[in-house]
Amino acid sequence: MTQLSPYDQVISRKRKWTPLAVQKGEVVEGSEDALKRALGLRHLELPVREFLQQGLDRELPNTPGLREALLSNQKDEENHDLALNYVIKAHGAEEKYEDEARHILRAWLDAPEHPILKAAILERSVFFVILPFF
C-alpha cells in the first residue's frame, strides 16, 4: 500500500463548502470594535491567494500533492473572501478599521519573504484565529 504524502493527506480530509449569505446577527455589547477590526482583515484574503500563486510560479519541491494543496488553498481563499464579504454586507464596515487593514496589507505586500511563507504566516496567525468567529 502506498503511503500518502502529508499534502495528499490534508487534501483527502478537506470537505467542499460554499459560502452563504448571512443575516445580521446579534453582537455582544462591547465586541463591536473587535468584530469590525477582524472583518477589516478580509483585505488580506485575496493577497494570500496571490502569494500562493507566486509560490506556484517558482520552483517547488517535487513532493506529491504539494502543488494540488496550494491550488486547493487558493480556492479556499476565494471562499473565505466571499464569506467575509457576506458578513460585511450584513454588519457593515468601519472606515478606520478598513484603513488599518489596508496598512497591514501594504506591509505584507512589501515584505521580502518568500510568498508561501507570507501566506502560511497570515493563515496561521490571522485567519485560523478569526474565521471561526464568523
Predicted regions and their residues:
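Non-heme di-metal
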Residues: 1-134
